[in-house]
Each structure stands twice: as C-alpha cells, then as structure tokens.
Amino acid sequence: MSDKLIIFDTTLRDGEQSPGASMTREEKIRIARQLERLKVDVIEAGFAASSNGDFEAIRSIAQVVKDSTICSLARANDKDIARAAEALKPANSFRIHTFIATSALHMEKKLRMTPDQVYEQARLAVRFARQFTDDIEFSPEDGSRSDMDFLCRVLEGVIAEGATTINLPDTVGYAVPEGYAELIRSVRERIPNSDKAVWSVHCHNDLGMAVANSLAAVKLGGARQIECTINGLGERAGNTSLEEVVMAVKTRRDYFNMDVGIDTTQIVPASKLVSQITGFVVQPNKAVVGANAFAHASGIHQDGVLKARDTYEIMRAEDVGWTANKIVLGKLSGRNAFKQRLQELGVQLESEAEINAAFARFKELADQKAEIFDEDIMAIVSDEEQEHANEHYRFISLSQRSETGERPHARVVFNIDGSEQTGEAEGNGPVDATLHAIEGKVNSGAELVLYSVNAITAGTQAQGEVTVRLSKAGRIVNGVGTDPDIVAASAKAYLAALNKLHDKAVQKINPQI
C-alpha cells in the first residue's frame, strides 16, 4: 500500500521573498485560487505578523479558498501566533507554522538566547498555538547545522506539546541527498514520539539539489511532506520546484511508492500565472513547465516519437496542462461566450461590473487582432484586476512621434490618485522617451534594473508583455504590462512597478527557513 505525500506550497510566502517578486493582495488571491485548482494540500499564504499587507492577504485567501488548508508562518512568540490565528480565522481548515532557530550560531549571534531558553520558548509557542488549532507545524531554523542532541530534545518537546508536523529545513541549500536523508532518518529514530508527527522537508536550491534532496528525504529518510514553490520561485537560487517533485513521484511511482493528490493538468496554468504575475520568465529548458520540455529537435527522436510516443517521452505534455493554442473567441463573440471561457480558465471576477469591464477590454483587443487566445484573456483579466486595486498611478493613454534622424517624443497621460497628469519627453527610443515622460512627472528616483519583452502568443499581432524591475532604497519590485503596442505595455509596466514602490506597508520580515 502506498503512502500519501503532502504537498505544501509556499509560493506566496517563501517564493515572494525572491527580489522583485512582491505581489499585491489581488495577485496573491489569483495564485491561491489556482493552487486550490491544482489541489495543493497546504497553502502557506504568508507571514501574518510581518506586515498589515500580509495579514490582509492571508485573511482574504482564507475567505475564498475552501479546499486547501491555509497556513501562516509565525515566530515562536504569542504575539505572532495570535496574529496568525486571527488572519486564518475565516478558513475552513488552517495551520499555524511556528519556528525558532536551534543552531549554536543562531542562538548566540541572532537570538542571544541559551539552549534552555530556546527549548522552553519552542515548547510554549506550540502550547499557545494549540489554543487555536490542532494543526501545528514546527520548524527548527538552521536545523541541519544544529547540535544533534539539542535538536532532538527540542523536537521531542514540541511534539509532546502538540506539534503535528515537524519540518527540517535545509536553510542555506548546503545539504546533499544522502546526507539530508540520513539526517531525517536519524532524528526520527532518536525521538521516541516521532511517530506522532508528519515529517517535512524544505530545501533551497543554492547547489542545484533542492529537488534531489527533497526526494531523497522522502524515499530514504521517511519524510511525508515536501515544501515547494511553483517554478522553484524563491530568493537566491530558489526553492524546491513543485512541478518537478510532483511529476517525479507520479512518473516514478514504481520507485517512490507514493501518491499525491495534485491535479497535474493544472501545473502549466499555475506556472504561467506565477510567471505572468511576478515577471520571472521560465527558462525554456526548465523541466515540466519550460517551453522546450516536450520539444524534440533531433530527427531520430522525432521519428521515434511519431512511431511511439513512449520511445522518448516519459510523461505526456497534456498530463501537465500543455495544450495547443486555440482560437477561443473573436470580435463577434458575445458576453456569455466570454464569461463561459473565463469560467473554463478558472477565472473568478468579483462582480458583474468587473466582468463587463473585462469584456469591454476584450472587444477593444478583438478590434486590434483577429485571433484571441487563452493567454490574451488571462492578460486582460490581469490588467482589469490591476485597475481595481486602488492604484496610486493609472495609465490612460499614450501618443508618440518618431522619425528617422530625430529623437523620439512621447506624451503619456495617466492618473495620480485620480488627478490626470500629462508627461512629455524625448529619448533615445520610443520606450526611453515614454519612461522619461512618466518619471518627469512622478520623480520617483527609482533605478531601472531590468526591462524585458515577451510575446504572449505567436504571430505579429501578438500582445507584448513587458516586465520592468525598479530598485529604490534597497527595495526591488516588478511591474508587468500587456498591450499589442509594446510602448504602451512599457508604460503600463512602469506604472505598475511604481504602484508597488508606493505601497506604504512596512518592510516585511523575511525569515530564512
């Protein structure tokens, strides 16, 4: 009989810590809904005590997602845990994930606490969390570099207090598969009450072994939960990729003898959504979700696949959600057809007014390009949700003039808190002139550190998707804009990034777990 492997997604918490990957509340809700469609077991929606923005995002997700357990991170103190419980209150099912560092280095230099103090605080934190839920996860931060005897003492203590999941993180991505699996196995064998908890792993990819370490811990160490993110999103080199561990376990069920509850046909839609929202492009040769993951260029391979797919394909593209682009709607399509397609794509707009506004954008786009694809519709929805996000800056219109031998000129009209502003400037090119026209009015002082353009679909009529990354005072944000006109998409992306910079939420606490 096979065991169940729990998939714990932390895209919205640890994934968001990747520089530039900060998301709005509305964007987090969209991703959470997609994770629910993916049938993720646990969604770590954020760190409630880190900022009011995270608290509100967690509470909103708890209100709308009903089929996955919603989790908030909390430091091992009453204030953090109570804040997490308050944010999670609307959820059908919720978990509190509390943590404290257990390595000698962290205890001495960061916490300035003795081992006995850390042991007691860990136990008291779990005991306090039990007032709110029976589903409690505990993580010993920097556990892989902790003294084994002390680590086992702490974990035995928190299990005795009611912790139901124990997570042993490879905080700095230093572990190797056999050694990490042995750590999990040894700790489980040394703790007399280890059978009272589910054992979890959380790996970082600094040495490119996050997936390998996680799978080794499952196969050889007895772990039954993997903490991961869509596309491996995360700070530094990223986290364990959800899509890779899930498909490894499903494809090699003969080896792992594990079941996962994931609807794998939702993997590619989830990957595309996270990429679109964060602006982090998926590399073409990325396993499972890369554009070339199922492409065969070799003539020998192509011949084999045509004769029998399993000659060179160990999994089918359609099983993970890859589908050929379909023309789904056109300029003669009506509102009901548009609404039906939104439902098929899993998009839930909050009101009829938002559906009407999105449909109006669709009709505008249909006048500009004859063929409308699913990716176009998703871009429309993304733009529409940004319009309803109480933006400080909002794009209205753009005009430009460019002739050979002359410097391009741009005129941008946009709102600042509802007040219409017009910026004009010249530049080295149309995009440069446009961004200077905006910056001349807002004077943000932000540094442009990345500008990239991608076509959403094939063909010369495709919408362009522009990603702009801005840096200011140590904060890095991404903005994404879409439009058939690349220059207009650039203006939208720049204003979207400025909106995130304008967010007055206190800089969040980003724990290294």
From Swiss-Prot:
Instruction: Tell me the leader sequence span.
Output: none
Which parts of this chain are annotated as the region Regulatory domain? 394-513
Entry's SMART domains? LeuA_dimer
Q: Which reactions is this enzyme annotated as catalysing?
A: 3-methyl-2-oxobutanoate + acetyl-CoA + H2O = (2S)-2-isopropylmalate + CoA + H(+)
Any Gene Ontology CC annotation: cytosol
Q: Which Enzyme Commission number(s) are on file for it? A: 2.3.3.13
Cell compartments where the protein resides:
Cytoplasm
SUPFAM superfamilies recorded: 2-isopropylmalate synthase LeuA, allosteric (dimerisation) domain, Aldolase
Q: Which cofactor does it need?
A: Mn(2+)
Primary location class: cytoplasm
Enumerate the Gene Ontology biological process terms.
Answer: L-leucine biosynthetic process
The UniProt record lists the Pyruvate carboxyltransferase domain at: 5-268
List the GO molecular function terms.
2-isopropylmalate synthase activity; acetyl-CoA C-acetyltransferase activity; manganese ion binding
Q: Does the keyword Transcription apply?
A: no
- Annotated pathway, please? Amino-acid biosynthesis; L-leucine biosynthesis; L-leucine from 3-methyl-2-oxobutanoate: step 1/4
Q: What does this protein do?
A: Catalyzes the condensation of the acetyl group of acetyl-CoA with 3-methyl-2-oxobutanoate (2-ketoisovalerate) to form 3-carboxy-3-hydroxy-4-methylpentanoate (2-isopropylmalate).
Q: How does it assemble?
A: Homodimer.
Q: What is this protein called?
A: 2-isopropylmalate synthase
Can you name the source organism?
A: Cupriavidus metallidurans (strain ATCC 43123 / DSM 2839 / NBRC 102507 / CH34)
Upper taxonomic lineage: Bacteria, Pseudomonadati, Pseudomonadota, Betaproteobacteria, Burkholderiales
In the UniProt record, the gene name given for this protein reads: leuA
